[in-house]
Amino acid sequence: MQFNISDIIKILPHSYPFLLVDRVIECDPSKSIKAIKNVTFNEPFFIGHFPNHPIMPGVLIVESLAQASAICILGKGSKSTMENKVVYLMSIENAKFRKPVTPGDTLILQADFKNARLSVCKFECFAYVGEEKVAEATILAMLQNI
């Protein structure tokens, strides 16, 4: 399954400037997802992080991975079954940042579903620029009614 930005804004509750997934290139719901965040110099966080040396904040890379994970969960259901659902980030474990992400990079977001208990899902997540791993984290997220 693939999703363009029009699909993504129907799935996620986020909006600019906090929508950090631009496209889904592969999604096997509840198994794995591969998505893209195009990093541009126009991102509002580059104004202060850092002037004259722009680097995407690590917490926003993790947020991108969490949003991709949420799409993996929410994208599996029909519009009617997921309409009143939201995915909340519960925890981030073992986050590692290996290389800076800068304007012009295409951030490839990979989230692999590991298991679920009740409404809590665990994902092993990786971010790449090209073939190079730039970040990784284990994410726990909870599906809730709103």
From Swiss-Prot:
GO-annotated biological processes: fatty acid biosynthetic process; lipid A biosynthetic process
Name the Pfam families for this protein.
Answer: FabA
User: Lyase: is it a keyword of this entry?
Assistant: yes
Specify whether Oxidoreductase is a keyword of the entry. Answer: no
Which family, according to the similarity comment? Belongs to the thioester dehydratase family. FabZ subfamily.
What the protein does comes down to: Involved in unsaturated fatty acids biosynthesis. Catalyzes the dehydration of short chain beta-hydroxyacyl-ACPs and long chain saturated and unsaturated beta-hydroxyacyl-ACPs.
Its top-level enzyme class, in one word, is lyase
Q: What is the lineage of its organism?
A: Bacteria, Pseudomonadati, Pseudomonadota, Alphaproteobacteria, Rickettsiales
Q: Where is the active site?
A: H49
Domain of life (superkingdom)? Bacteria
* Catalytic activity line of the entry: a (3R)-hydroxyacyl-[ACP] = a (2E)-enoyl-[ACP] + H2O
Query: Which GO cellular component terms are attached?
Result: cytoplasm; membrane
CDD domains (UniProt xref): FabZ
One molecular function GO term is: (3R)-hydroxyacyl-[acyl-carrier-protein] dehydratase activity
By which gene is this protein encoded? Answer: fabZ
Report keywords, A-Z.
Answer: Cytoplasm, Lipid A biosynthesis, Lipid biosynthesis, Lipid metabolism, Lyase
Q: Where in the cell is it found?
A: Cytoplasm
Q: What is this protein called?
A: 3-hydroxyacyl-[acyl-carrier-protein] dehydratase FabZ
Enzyme Commission numbers on file? 4.2.1.59
